[in-house]
Design a protein with these regions (language model features):
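Conserved alpha-helical substructure of the radical SAM core
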Residues: 1-113, 124, 128, 132, ...
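Radical SAM enzyme [4Fe-4S]-AdoMet core and its adjacent flexible, acidic
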Residues: 14, 29-43, 51, 104-194
Length: 194
């Protein structure tokens, strides 16, 4: 940044250390680990982080392990990224708390990409692997993304899919569930991280 005046860092921000799901492959499913992962950044603290770092950020990713939609100031955080001219702002979420209104406000305020965690493309597998998740809410969110992309065609949808023996066969169903709005598919093998 100092020499060329270019942005070069990615900032990965979890504004809250909590999750509404208990996915089988995630550390938030481990009760002991969950007890040690607590806390919420106040918006004022996020503003201080932004003042120190966002002017050098090439990308701001909100949510990188926890569930950012649990933070009451989510849209303000996204807008803060754009206020500092961060070129690319993304949100990683399970999506079950992301209403059409909240998503529309986030995109209007500068959200460039939505990364949705989905570990099954049938109700049975989705709800088994993503404990507390509702497949109907996931499908409703995908319909909302389709609507929002009509107004904001540059808005991107990424699906994060953790592959395991329970869901590998369901990858063939991705197009019937997600449709043509998918821009990026992120695949990774399951691993025990908790």
């Amino acid at each position: 940044f100092h020499v060329l005046g270019k942005r070069y860092i990615g900032i990965f921000l979890d504004p809250v250390l909590a999750c509404n799901f208990r996915c089988k492959m995630c550390y938030f499913s481990d009760e002991q680990k969950r007890k040690s992962l607590r806390g919420t950044l106040k918006y004022e603290e996020i503003e201080a982080i932004a003042g120190s770092l966002f002017h050098r950020a090439l990308k701001l990713q909100v949510g990188c392990g926890a569930e950012p939609t649990l933070h009451k100031d989510l849209v303000k955080i996204i807008a803060l990224g754009k206020r500092y001219n961060v070129p690319y702002v993304s949100l990683t979420t399970n999506g079950n708390l992301l209403t059409k209104e909240l998503l529309a406000a986030a995109v209007k305020n500068g959200l460039d990409e939505l990364t949705l965690s989905a570990h099954g493309f049938t109700r049975e597998t989705y709800e088994y692997l993503m404990t507390n998740g509702k497949f109907d809410l996931f499908c409703k969110l995908l319909a909302n993304v389709t609507e929002i992309k009509k107004q904001y065609p540059q808005f991107k949808l990424r699906i994060n899919y953790t592959i395991n023996n329970n869901n590998i066969e369901e990858l063939s169903r991705i197009w019937e569930v997600v449709g043509d709005e998918l821009d990026i598919l992120q695949l990774r093998p399951i691993q025990k991280i908790g």
